[in-house]
């Protein structure tokens, strides 16, 4: 089984043998560099890669992504804060660790789910519940070693699409900063079928290529 992404068509295809057996909507980055002052949009870089792993993703680059999706929360209105649970099971301040205030959390949850409250778990990580990582296999052994590194681009969903899926609304995929956005149910389907299994070959085609 191989994965093939056609960014010009917003299409991810599953290939078995010489035949494409299924396709899914998938949106990557733009064909040329963008101008977002926070982090410029970039193309999803063409090439042949190897799927490495699937895991929750956190990064200091984006405030809402400093906390893992699904992390337990405690509302603390008396001190105008929200606490989140650390891996140690202790609690820490969202405001102190991310700069995100309680009002922003409530407003964001209302935007996503239509309810003015602090949710029970963190549903704001920009990369969704899980990210699927890949790397350029320079020595052809399908193992991340030597000077090889994981790509900063990855498959993931978004908080908006996770909310739409949860509320049974139409999924509105949007372009990314270079990663590949998937619909939550499509991610689960591909994952359960073994499409994201480590060592799977993954090809990003040029923007002018079609399936």
Spell out what each predicted region is.
Residues 1-102, 205-207, 211:
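Intrinsically disordered, low-complexity
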């Amino acid at each position: 089984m191989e994965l093939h992404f056609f960014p010009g068509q917003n299409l991810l295809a599953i290939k078995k043998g010489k035949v494409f057996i299924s396709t899914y909507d998938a949106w990557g980055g733009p064909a040329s560099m963008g101008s977002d002052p926070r982090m410029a949009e970039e193309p999803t870089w063409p090439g042949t890669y190897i799927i490495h792993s699937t895991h929750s993703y956190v990064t200091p680059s984006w405030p809402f992504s400093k906390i893992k999706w699904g992390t337990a929360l405690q509302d603390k209105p008396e001190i105008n804060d929200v606490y989140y649970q650390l891996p140690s099971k202790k609690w820490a301040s969202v405001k102190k660790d991310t700069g995100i205030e309680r009002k922003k959390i409530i407003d964001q949850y209302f935007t996503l789910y239509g309810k003015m409250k602090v949710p029970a778990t963190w549903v704001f990580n920009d990369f969704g519940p899980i990210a699927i990582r890949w790397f350029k296999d320079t020595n052809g052994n399908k193992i991340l070693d030597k000077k090889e590194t994981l790509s900063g681009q990855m498959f993931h969903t978004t908080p908006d699409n996770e909310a739409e899926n949860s509320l049974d609304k139409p999924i509105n995929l949007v372009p990314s900063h270079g990663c590949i956005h998937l619909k939550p149910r499509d991610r689960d389907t591909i994952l359960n079928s073994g499409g994201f299994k480590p060592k799977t070959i993954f090809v990003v085609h040029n923007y002018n290529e079609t399936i």
